[in-house]
Amino acid sequence: MDKNSLWQRYVPLVRHEALRLQVRLPASVELDDLLQAGGIGLLNAVERYDRLQGTAFTTYAVQRIRGAMLDELRSRDWAPRSVRRNAREVASAMQKVEQRLGRPATEQEVAQNLDIDLTEYRQILLDTNNSQLFSYDEWREEHGESVEPMLEGHEDANPLQHLLEGNLRQRVIEAIEALPEREKMVLTLYYQEELNLKEIGAVLEVGESRVSQLHSQAIKRLRARLNNDS
């Protein structure tokens, strides 16, 4: 098959990968931008593919397409500073509330401390969690491995693994055990069982966005507890 035929045959793969990636990103990320980057990735795959290396073209093309899309996202620093700032503010508020009450803070209590309503609080959880989950899934797709062998320099990709490293491990395990049951289950199903958000939602009988919020809140709660203990 010549290069032009190869390109035409695999163009639909670009859209497939773009749609898969878009669902994990904020609404501000345009599908057209992903398609354009993915198209460049496919073009590179067509130009550089060597069948003598023994890799199927589909496998090689997917790697190039995803890589080009991820490069585009990294170059644009897609997670706005406001998202990072909000994440820090939520973690700080949660720490203060739990320190004062001596128990896990409810969503309403954290929202009240931040002087925002519950809807706005849950949107912050959703936005910040998209960043965390995207980073982890990006790492997992690039390396094709599970959580355990996280490479040095990728500690932000898996927030739970990062917390478990070093001398914090026992404290983190104890903090996880003290989490509200649903938050603990989300972490277990996502990081250990490697279920996606839709599958976890089916287990908990909630929507994907609610799973995302629970994950975000669990990670922030863990960090708040560790800060309280330090």
From Swiss-Prot:
<dbReference type="GO" id="GO:0003677">
    <property type="term" value="F:DNA binding"/>
</dbReference>
<dbReference type="Pfam" id="PF04542">
    <property type="entry name" value="Sigma70_r2"/>
</dbReference>
<dbReference type="InterPro" id="IPR013324">
    <property type="entry name" value="RNA_pol_sigma_r3/r4-like"/>
</dbReference>
<dbReference type="InterPro" id="IPR013325">
    <property type="entry name" value="RNA_pol_sigma_r2"/>
</dbReference>
<feature type="region of interest" description="Sigma-70 factor domain-2">
    <location>
        <begin position="6"/>
        <end position="78"/>
    </location>
</feature>
<feature type="region of interest" description="Sigma-70 factor domain-4">
    <location>
        <begin position="175"/>
        <end position="223"/>
    </location>
</feature>
<dbReference type="InterPro" id="IPR014284">
    <property type="entry name" value="RNA_pol_sigma-70_dom"/>
</dbReference>
<feature type="short sequence motif" description="Interaction with polymerase core subunit RpoC">
    <location>
        <begin position="33"/>
        <end position="36"/>
    </location>
</feature>
<dbReference type="InterPro" id="IPR028617">
    <property type="entry name" value="Sigma70_FliA"/>
</dbReference>
<dbReference type="InterPro" id="IPR007627">
    <property type="entry name" value="RNA_pol_sigma70_r2"/>
</dbReference>
<feature type="DNA-binding region" description="H-T-H motif">
    <location>
        <begin position="197"/>
        <end position="216"/>
    </location>
</feature>
<keyword id="KW-0963">Cytoplasm</keyword>
<dbReference type="Pfam" id="PF04539">
    <property type="entry name" value="Sigma70_r3"/>
</dbReference>
<dbReference type="GO" id="GO:0003899">
    <property type="term" value="F:DNA-directed RNA polymerase activity"/>
</dbReference>
<feature type="region of interest" description="Sigma-70 factor domain-3">
    <location>
        <begin position="86"/>
        <end position="156"/>
    </location>
</feature>
<keyword id="KW-0805">Transcription regulation</keyword>
<dbReference type="GO" id="GO:0005737">
    <property type="term" value="C:cytoplasm"/>
</dbReference>
<keyword id="KW-0731">Sigma factor</keyword>
<dbReference type="InterPro" id="IPR000943">
    <property type="entry name" value="RNA_pol_sigma70"/>
</dbReference>
<protein>
    <recommendedName>
        <fullName>RNA polymerase sigma factor FliA</fullName>
    </recommendedName>
</protein>
<comment type="similarity">
    <text>Belongs to the sigma-70 factor family. FliA subfamily.</text>
</comment>
<keyword id="KW-0238">DNA-binding</keyword>
<dbReference type="Pfam" id="PF04545">
    <property type="entry name" value="Sigma70_r4"/>
</dbReference>
<comment type="function">
    <text>Sigma factors are initiation factors that promote the attachment of RNA polymerase to specific initiation sites and are then released. This sigma factor controls the expression of flagella-related genes.</text>
</comment>
<dbReference type="InterPro" id="IPR007630">
    <property type="entry name" value="RNA_pol_sigma70_r4"/>
</dbReference>
<dbReference type="InterPro" id="IPR007624">
    <property type="entry name" value="RNA_pol_sigma70_r3"/>
</dbReference>
<keyword id="KW-0804">Transcription</keyword>
<dbReference type="InterPro" id="IPR012845">
    <property type="entry name" value="RNA_pol_sigma_FliA_WhiG"/>
</dbReference>
<dbReference type="GO" id="GO:0016987">
    <property type="term" value="F:sigma factor activity"/>
</dbReference>
<dbReference type="GO" id="GO:0006352">
    <property type="term" value="P:DNA-templated transcription initiation"/>
</dbReference>
